[in-house]
Amino acid sequence: AYADRSKYLGDQEFFDAPVENLISKKYAEKISKKIKSGEELKVEPGIYFYEGDQTTHFSIIDYEGNVVSNTYTLNTAYGSGIVAKGTGILMNNEMDDFSIKPGTPNVYGLIGSEANKIESNKSPLSSMSPTIVFKDSRPFLITGSQGGSMIINTVLQEILNTIEFNMKLSESNEKSRIHYQWKPSVLLHEGLNKSLIDELSKNMKLIERKIGETQ
């Protein structure tokens, strides 16, 4: 998924992504056949995992059933490091979410393509995923997370836990998590049991670290 993100995703006002094909079961089956046990993707030099905890997410529901899922960020710690004079407000450095040039990683190690190149009046590709899931036309799940490039997988696992595995939110939030973003070819994990770690370690490099926080 992160490989396709790198190639196809960007501001849809500027680039026509093949969404229907990317979410089709036929394409998913085709991609799944390319996954080979024990095969590690080549990792280019200069790709680092640097994450801060500055992104903020909140989920709110009121007594009338109105809901809000909001994620906002400066991007990296202290954003651009510039404060708007007389305001105390830090300016972000969201320009890093654009692709400097195809194949060049941003501060989170994410690779971009022409679809996400810098252009005037264009929005950069973001990992922020504030989510509201509806069931029978009513809000069923309100969620989101912080964590830079890990947000996508954190929110996905929250949705899968509650919808596919019928977990309560409190149970889902305490569950172990994993994160893999194509490049670097490293699986980040939080809270996996030893037997699973031993099994996964046979096929890839694992790093234990904190992965996002959902609300």
What is each of the regions a protein language model found here?
Residues 1, 65, 132, 155, ...:
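Hydrophobic, well-ordered secondary-structure elements that form the walls
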Residues 2-74, 86-87, 94, 102-103, ...:
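Internal maturation/activation junctions in enzymes
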Residues 2-9, 35, 39, 95, ...:
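Structural signal for hydrophobic packing residues in well-ordered secondary-structure cores
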Residues 47-51, 116-124, 208-212:
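Short Gly/Pro-enriched turn/cap motifs at secondary-structure boundaries
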Residues 62, 133-134, 140:
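Extended hydrophobic
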Residues 67-135, 165, 169:
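Active-site rim segments in enzyme catalytic domains, especially the processed small/beta chain
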Residues 122, 164-213:
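Extended C-terminal subregions enriched in glycine
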Residues 145-167:
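Alpha-helical support elements that line or immediately flank enzyme active sites
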